[in-house]
């Protein structure tokens, strides 16, 4: 059991995929060092979260300044106020309040409460308990004027993370620096019409990388798209269901159901050699099993040469030192865009819920203001 559960503590809690704790820890150490904070990480294999220990004031600084969307391996992040031991205690809500009360000046009146668990089979068995416990806890927090009577989207959120049945970690996050989804998990249903499960990666990517209020403008019917390495059509399916006209590039066969829509043109060609005849492509997507540096260079060249406006693609991860590798891939892309490009750009990367041994990257030119 980690030290943070057994004792007092402040810091940052980060949730990640089980098995990627070391990568999440390496990333938070690197990013906080850039902020001038030098804490230390504590985690265990397969526990699906990392605790970064630092002073309370430093945790507050990180919670405000380190953007969740700039972290690749962290799904959710909150500033830790302290651990709670609830084993054998009937009034668990009071124990949570004891941790929160001394720090109320930090977060003021919270606008929402999130009770959850790390994403492990053992912890997920507590999901039903978390839903039930949320009701009396919410009432108790409102009575103590720690939580607003109605959800307030612009106020901080309180977090109670049950790491096992006996212990929880309590903290807060700011409204501008949190995920819409509990645990950062975007749960999606697999469509019967989709040719492969890989379709869920692109579906999630659109939801994570494109803000909901920009979907109508940036992801809509009638757009032109290209899918490199498309067969059998898992990613093409997501473009088709959004009403796009797609050039699916792959020497392999495409699902007949997609070809019957009339929205797909199958081009049997090498994805690394193909280029569209016209400069009217909005979206480029790619899920090819290739060397990450090679894929990154290809995607960057499409943007630089005006062959697309936005790109979503996967980069396969090595078995070891994954964060160092990812940083190298992304730095290479940034350097190429900064050196050869003439416009401001945005790059986002995330180890999505539906990703396994890969990360998903989004690139786009930013509109000139």
UniProtKB/Swiss-Prot annotation:
Keywords for the protein's UniProt record, in alphabetical order: Cytoplasm, Methyltransferase, rRNA processing, S-adenosyl-L-methionine, Transferase
UniProt: S-adenosyl-L-methionine binding residues: 198, 231-234, 250, 270, 287
Cell compartments where the protein resides: Cytoplasm
Gene Ontology CC annotation, any one: cytoplasm
Domain of life: Bacteria
Single GO BP term: rRNA processing
MF-aspect GO terms: S-adenosylmethionine-dependent methyltransferase activity
Enzyme Commission code: 2.1.1.186
Catalytic residue positions: 316 (proton acceptor)
Keyword S-adenosyl-L-methionine: yes
Reaction(s) the record says it catalyses: cytidine(2498) in 23S rRNA + S-adenosyl-L-methionine = 2'-O-methylcytidine(2498) in 23S rRNA + S-adenosyl-L-homocysteine + H(+)
Gene3D superfamilies: 3.30.2300.20, 3.30.70.2810, Vaccinia Virus protein VP39 (3.40.50.150)
Family indicated by similarity: Belongs to the class I-like SAM-binding methyltransferase superfamily. RNA methyltransferase RlmE family. RlmM subfamily.
Assembly, per entry: Monomer.
Alphabetized NCBIfam families for the sequence: PRK11760.1 (NF008734)
Function summary: Catalyzes the 2'-O-methylation at nucleotide C2498 in 23S rRNA.
Protein name: Ribosomal RNA large subunit methyltransferase M
Species, as recorded: Idiomarina loihiensis (strain ATCC BAA-735 / DSM 15497 / L2-TR)
Organism classification: Bacteria, Pseudomonadati, Pseudomonadota, Gammaproteobacteria, Alteromonadales
